[in-house]
């Protein structure tokens, strides 16, 4: 081990850590978990399209029970939420998250109330019909604009946008297009593009190793939300490309850059986290954590 360099030690330690945890899970129970994950994904999509939560509810219940079971195998005696948190944000604990969210909520509640009490802009123009094919063209424009390389990736369509990578040279972005909400696909493209650019810039020497993967979801999400909010909601970001956006999406020709800029920064209450504005987005996360805390300490729902 004395001859290992930093990156090699990272790979070794990460593999050992994951292997020790995974070995504690009975194979047959893990197989049940994987099958239910696949079935749950299909049920969620069916429920979403039918607007019927009852289709997904039993699968959600099973997944919660199985997730708690897996956490009990990997870290027995530890709070379930802390076990899961450590998978996505290594070394983080719920006490730190609670403190952070408490400060955030204290500052955000009066701010949101003040904003919502003000006169709201008219967003009628943004609910006209926007051809999904035109939205795809705008998406491709924006991905190219922010630096996503199609030579090292691809773009597809799914019910829920996400980014998937198999190496730094094969990074796949997905999106969803709503006929009466063009901004959704635009900002999903910018957000997922941020994730993808992170992956495309990983040193190829570290592809498919722990040194080339991000063990801190906060780091990865900081990149996607930097592109989405710090860049994408800045008026200067759109000045070089807005006329091209209008060319690709004819309905946008009746919407000035100032109107567009106001709409992409419009603060409103919403039910969907991924569609939330920059200000209210945090409440979706805080609410989910609150739902965990108001139930049994080790429950997930």
List where the protein language model places each region.
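Noncatalytic, helix-rich "gating/capping" subdomain that lines the substrate-entry/channel surface
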Residues: 1, 7-57
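Contiguous, non-catalytic segments that form substrate-binding/exosite surfaces or channel walls
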Residues: 34-184
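Active-site recognition of the HExxH zinc-binding catalytic motif
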Residues: 187-200, 221-225
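Long, amphipathic alpha-helical stalk/connector segments used for oligomerization, subunit docking
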Residues: 236-291, 295, 299
């Amino acid at each position: 081990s004395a001859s290992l360099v930093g990156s090699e030690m990272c790979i070794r330690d990460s593999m050992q850590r994951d292997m020790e945890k995974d070995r504690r899970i009975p194979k047959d129970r893990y197989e049940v978990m994987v099958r239910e994950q696949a079935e749950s994904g299909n049920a969620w999509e069916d429920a979403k399209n039918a607007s019927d939560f009852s289709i997904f509810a039993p699968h959600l219940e099973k997944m919660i029970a199985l997730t708690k079971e897996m956490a009990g195998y990997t870290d027995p005696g530890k709070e379930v939420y802390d076990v899961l948190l450590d998978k996505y944000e290594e070394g983080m604990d719920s006490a730190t998250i609670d403190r952070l969210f408490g400060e955030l909520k204290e500052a955000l509640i009066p701010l949101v109330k003040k904003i919502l009490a003000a006169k709201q802009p008219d967003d009628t123009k943004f609910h006209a019909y926007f051809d999904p094919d035109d939205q795809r063209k705008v998406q491709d424009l924006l991905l190219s604009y922010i630096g996503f390389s199609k030579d090292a990736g691809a773009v597809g369509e799914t019910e829920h946008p996400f980014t998937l990578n198999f190496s730094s040279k094969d990074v796949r972005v997905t999106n969803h297009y709503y006929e009466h909400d063009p901004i959704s696909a635009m900002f999903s493209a910018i957000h997922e593009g941020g994730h993808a650019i992170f992956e495309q810039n990983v040193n190829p020497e570290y592809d498919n190793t722990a040194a080339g993967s991000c063990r801190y979801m906060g780091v990865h999400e900081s990149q996607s939300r930097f592109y989405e909010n710090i860049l994408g909601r800045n008026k200067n970001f759109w000045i070089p490309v807005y006329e091209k956006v209008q060319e690709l999406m004819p309905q946008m020709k009746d919407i000035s850059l100032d109107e567009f800029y106001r709409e992409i920064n419009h603060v409103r209450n919403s039910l969907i986290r991924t569609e939330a504005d920059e200000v209210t987005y945090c409440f979706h996360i805080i609410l989910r954590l609150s739902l965990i805390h108001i139930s049994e300490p080790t429950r997930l729902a």
